[in-house]
Amino acid sequence: MGINQWEQAEPGVKRKIHSPGNEVMMMEVVFEEGAEGSSHSHPHEQLTYCLEGKLAFQIDGKEVLLEQGQSVHIPSNAVHGVKALMPSRLLDVFTPLREDLLN
């Protein structure tokens, strides 16, 4: 995945990694209404901030609704997925770097 380039992540979901640091990185993600980010986990801590829209997250079996201006912390190794309830845009911040997304 290229830095500062949009990439199709899943149907109705595109993402762009902004210039990463040494230990932290930020990724912008845009969802069409009804689009989903499949459930997964990773050893990285994640902070997600909703720039626009409304999304329903499942985090370790609990539903968390996120609207514009709200954020959520996703702990290391937590199983999580998301569904956009309307067109949405968010920022994900990861530490340490998500090497799996950078390579």
Specify the residue positions occupied by each region the protein language model found.
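Conserved short histidine dyad/triad with adjacent acidic residue
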Residues: 27-41
